[in-house]
Amino acid sequence: RYHCTDICDGESQGTDGINYSLASREMIANMIEIHANATPFDAGVYLSSCDKGVPGNLMGLARVNIPSVFVPGGTMNAGPEMLTLEQLGMYSAKFERGEINEEKLDWAKCNACPSCGACSFIGTASTMQIMAEALGLALPGTALMPATSPDLLDFAREAGRQAVRIAQMENMRPSDIVTMDSFENAILVHAAISGSTNCLLHLPAIAHEFGIEITGDTFDKLHRNARYLLDVRPAGRWPAECFYYAGGVPAIMEEIKEHLHLDVMTVTGKTLGENLEELKNNGFYEK
């Protein structure tokens, strides 16, 4: 088991520290490559949650190219009054206008991050967790689970078992799963969730590690006829922890599946279409 430090963009924004943010993605990918190749493994499980950690892990996963499963680290709980981190700007503005007192501002600051997990809105971290699943590199339904849920630990253990299965039975590598069609699916999901624009930095970098080229024009072409479906902050009303309970990535894909490449492979060893059908039949959405 190896760890690599990550940074928090929320803490570095507005300071010179933000200049280190994108560089940290490269360092994470580099350290994954170093550890995986210095101590050879037959398979890997990668777990990350946040802005540069998720794309860094996906880049490293592609570079190492051993049978692998990615585990999204989940989303933070909402605070009292459904408070989430991106609302602090609103509270700060209200304080500056004299609409709330300092005590209320301090309350918001102290309650906006009540648990571990990615910030509870569709920022870069949430977007990239969703992209990992949309690419077929995470188990179905695992993106943006509440980080405090015991189900997340169960899925992490299942990811380990699945990594062993694909190593023993099929030796299926990330490069056998991810294709241009996989990236087109992910970009359509990105449109449907109104995902972070930072995805335009990260998906091309991940694609590059797979020897695939995508550009801003790729996003533009696919987004023009795409549907926006997700009512989650900052573009919508609800905290990101609601995403999982509404069906998560599979529910989004069901809504847009006529536009998706359903024959792409995933880490389950089955196609996307097979996964979606299996989830419907096994009561996933009712749960």
Question: What function would you assign to each model-found segment?
Answer:
Residues R1-C4, G17-S21, V54, G60-I66, ...:
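Catalytic or ion-coupling anion/metal-binding cores of large enzyme and transporter domains
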Residues R1-P72:
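Long, structured ligand/cofactor-binding scaffold of large enzymes
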